[in-house]
A protein has these predicted regions:
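A compositional/biophysical signature of low hydrophobicity enriched in polar/charged and small residues
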Residues: 1-169
């Protein structure tokens, strides 16, 4: 009996992930508030939005089950931690193993993010280092990966906004 229940639950979750619910104005407002500060209690969130705590909990769970909310985190000031050198590295890749090569880049220490892109370069990596030497070594490690044709490194002067601060919901 339990096996059948688990199987039905799994199928429902898979269906919900593949067929997400349509968002209404309240869902959008809730997402916007959670992007601003996901650490708030459900009670505070309910008060700010003007709904009951139970309704907020149900909506958040529904957004999680539908795949709109994929996790929670915090924003860290990496400069305060000593990461003074941030760079955007554009990567040109030859061959058919694009995703494998991007995966290798992602596993290199100091690589904070890797995006598969279109345009003049096949991928973009964000690198965060404490010293110029670490940055140089990281770019050289990327270039040493078989399949990486060339890179173009852009030093970040100032971070004006972060991707986690994008609130257009």
């Amino acid at each position: 009996m339990y096996g059948r229940y688990i199987n039905i639950t799994y199928k429902c979750l898979v269906y919900m992930k593949n067929n997400p619910k349509k968002l209404d104005e309240l869902d959008n407002r809730l997402l916007k508030e959670l992007v601003k500060n996901s650490k708030r209690s459900y009670r505070t969130l309910a008060k700010d939005i003007g709904m009951s705590t139970t309704a907020i909990i149900e909506r958040v769970r529904s957004l999680e089950d539908s795949g709109y909310i994929t996790g929670y985190g915090c924003r860290v000031d990496y400069q305060k931690l000593g990461f003074e050198f941030m760079a955007i590295v554009e990567i040109s890749i030859f061959g058919k193993d694009l995703l494998q090569i991007e995966g290798k880049v992602a596993r290199i220490p100091h690589v904070a993010a890797v995006w598969d892109t279109t345009g003049n370069y096949d991928a973009i990596a964000i690198i965060m280092c404490k010293t110029r030497g670490e940055l140089s070594a990281t770019v050289k490690k990327i270039l040493s990966i078989s399949g990486v044709e060339k890179t173009n490194t852009n030093m970040v002067l100032n971070v004006v906004t972060r991707l986690t601060e994008f609130e257009e919901v």
